[in-house]
Amino acid sequence: LSLHDALPIYLTEADLANHRVDWVELLSRDFAGGSVQELPPNGQGIATLIALGILEQCGIEKHHPDSVQGLHLSIEAMKLALADLDRYVADEEHMEFAAKALLSDHYLKSRAALINHDKASDFVYGSPTQSGTVYLSAADSSGMMISFIQSNFMGFGSGIVVPDTGISLQNRGCGFVLDPKHPNALAGSKRPFHTIIPGFAMDGNGKPLMSFGVMGGPMQAQGHMQMALRIMLHGQNPQAAIDAPRWRVVQGREVVVESTFDRNTIAALRERGHQIVVEDPLQDYNFGGAQVIYRMPEGHYVAATESRKDGQALVS
């Protein structure tokens, strides 16, 4: 508190005293015979579910994730999801409506109808109502699976260390916006929008299927969608899905792809109006770091880890 008094901080002693940890209900969407689970706002996991719901409306099961059409539809769906994410998502207690409104079939169908299947488009948010990260996945012989993620944000967080403690303060307040009319406006007693999201999937019988995460700021929701498409819908081996070329939506029509992308695919996406930028994943580190544990039908597990950055799959 003495540190707080010495700095221009919005939080008050009452905010700290009234803070609570919530046991939340996961957001869920049926997908590829199972379901994908994400934490509700104030995180970005809902963008994965929005994009997957839009893709189902587009008949994505007909297109391989590496095909031009599969990539085109996936990119457009994620652009729509990110537009809604930026406009609406905040601490759910301060959102204009319940987060589930963004996942209704009626709304997702209306969003999917905006996609031109032959050409890239610019999207804005819709109207669902009328009016620095570490990831850990673990599983045991009993079938229990855990998906866990944590981050101080932006390196060592705020750069502020509480005197005489060695405790560095995180920097997630950076996720607030300064527009007082925005649902994610800076204020005390309020959680900021943030990017850290552990992913989870269930099979068609409601049993744990996959615990997964893709570290990397705004790449996380995009990476979750790409993992779900490859592993759940197209049956790819989890390690093959992690190693496959990734893409990420930046802004407007700009899409960054890894340099391992097929040249003909890049050319075809550009012909559809996507502004493609090629980056080396081993130099730019902007495509996230994935970790996956997948439960096989007989109860065994397949663990897969990232090749682009530090990561390890262990059996103990």
Which positions does each model-derived feature cover?
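Extended C-terminal subregions enriched in glycine
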Residues: 142, 190, 224, 233-284
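Non-catalytic beta-strand/loop surface segments
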Residues: 11-37, 192
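Alpha-helical support elements that line or immediately flank enzyme active sites
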Residues: 6, 214-236
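Internal maturation/activation junctions in enzymes
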Residues: 9, 57-152, 164-165, 172, ...
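Short, small-residue-biased leader/transition segments that mark boundaries at the very start
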Residues: 1-7
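Extended C-terminal regions of large enzymes
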Residues: 38-41, 201-219
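Active-site rim segments in enzyme catalytic domains, especially the processed small/beta chain
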Residues: 10-12, 144-210, 234, 238
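Short, small/polar residue-rich loop motifs at catalytic or cofactor-binding pockets
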Residues: 23, 130-133, 194-196
